[in-house]
Amino acid sequence: MTVFVKICGLCEEQHVNAAIEAGADALGFVFAKSPREVTPAQAASISADIPSNILRVAVMLHPTNESWQKVLKEFLPDVLQADAQDFMSLDIPESVEKWPVFRQGGKIPNVSDRYVFEGPQSGCGEIVDWKSASVIKNNNNMILAGGLDPGNVAKAIAMVNPFGVDVSSGVESGPGKKDIHMIKKFVSAAKAAEKSL
């Protein structure tokens, strides 16, 4: 099994490049109030050289259709990641993959596609209850997020056996400040963990 790795909340080209070099499978750009927030134009600029085999993910929280259309037009994402209920009010082309976010403590429907499982709040480093995540029936579609870092990602993968892992604050030296060394350590730890499964 190959563990899918997403590095989220990228704001600078050097960190985008570090994530690509480290072997990340997806890169997330946040279009919501956060220390990691970027504009669609900024995201388009720093992601211009991402290879086509790496997914560009637009991360949004309760967006209006107008704000989503701006992101769609300027950034051209491969994936939209948003809370599950947000998708109903958005006009999303079939070419864009949808990753609904389901939060710990809420109901997880039996979804057949990729989804993100995380804590009550995004990007705050709060560790999800891995034990409860491990018993979700469709965790082979789960991208596990919430409180992951280079030191605990292997343990999380071993316990939950998700499709993938997603990190933001766990590879930062401060709020919104990505650390190249931590990005590389996280991807290495996640990719090494798959060998023990």
Regions inferred by a protein language model and the residue ranges of each:
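Conserved N-terminal beta1-alpha1 strand-loop-helix module at the mouth
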Residues: M1-F117, S122-L197
